[in-house]
């Protein structure tokens, strides 16, 4: 038995554009149904199945609620499997990455919490733009190579956003 499509678990059609609030609501509903505690008095087999369903549901939810992970998953289920680590051949984006990293390093050295907040807003705007670009590209036939490039950019920005949140927490303490 294979793992069901993440979208099918939530009764959704594969799409990049999702209503994340509805996804979260549906996740909570389904999680209650398959929660292993509900099967505490069931047979060992039923408990194992409940645990597997719960794990699959959690994995599907984590994938679909994250834009970069959702983009990678869409590419994979469409037959465009993307290796995890690939050198990015995009000089403009590489330059932008270096500039963002230098700026973040300066903000850290200066312990500039307000500056980190401004940086975080700019990063969020860049993420929103990339998400829209990917969604438009995904909806256009024959754009899978561009979709892959955009997904890689999304992954980088997601990682950078995590680093920004960590810096913000350190500076806020």
UniProtKB/Swiss-Prot annotation:
GO terms for biological process: [2Fe-2S] cluster assembly; protein complex oligomerization; protein folding. GO terms for cellular component: iron-sulfur cluster transfer complex. Residues 5-77 form the J domain. SUPFAM superfamilies: Chaperone J-domain, HSC20 (HSCB), C-terminal oligomerisation domain. Keywords: Chaperone. Pfam families: DnaJ (PF00226), HSCB_C (PF07743). Disulfide bonds: none annotated. One of its GO terms (molecular function) is protein-folding chaperone binding. InterPro entries: DnaJ_domain, HscB, HscB_C_sf, HscB_oligo_C, J_dom_sf. Co-chaperone involved in the maturation of iron-sulfur cluster-containing proteins. Seems to help targeting proteins to be folded toward HscA. HAMAP family: HscB (MF_00682). Belongs to the HscB family. Interacts with HscA and stimulates its ATPase activity. This is Co-chaperone protein HscB homolog. It comes from Pseudomonas putida (strain ATCC 700007 / DSM 6899 / JCM 31910 / BCRC 17059 / LMG 24140 / F1). The lineage of its organism: Bacteria, Pseudomonadati, Pseudomonadota, Gammaproteobacteria, Pseudomonadales.
């Amino acid at each position: 038995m294979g793992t069901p499509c993440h979208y099918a678990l939530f009764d959704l059609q594969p799409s990049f554009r999702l209503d994340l609030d509805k996804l979260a609501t549906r996740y909570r509903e389904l999680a209650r149904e398959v929660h292993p505690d509900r099967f505490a008095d069931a047979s060992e087999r039923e408990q194992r199945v409940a645990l597997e369903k719960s794990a699959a549901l959690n994995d599907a939810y984590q994938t679909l609620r994250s834009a970069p992970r959702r983009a990678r998953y869409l590419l994979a289920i469409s037959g465009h499997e993307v290796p995890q680590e690939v050198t990015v051949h995009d000089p403009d984006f590489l330059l932008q990455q270096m500039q963002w990293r230098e700026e973040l390093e300066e903000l850290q050295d200066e312990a500039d919490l307000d500056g980190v907040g401004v940086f975080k807003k700019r990063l969020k705007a860049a993420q929103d733009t990339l998400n829209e670009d990917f969604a438009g590209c995904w909806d256009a036939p024959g754009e899978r190579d561009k979709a892959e490039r955009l997904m890689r950019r999304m992954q980088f920005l997601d990682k950078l956003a995590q680093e920004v949140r960590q810096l913000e927490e350190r500076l806020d303490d």
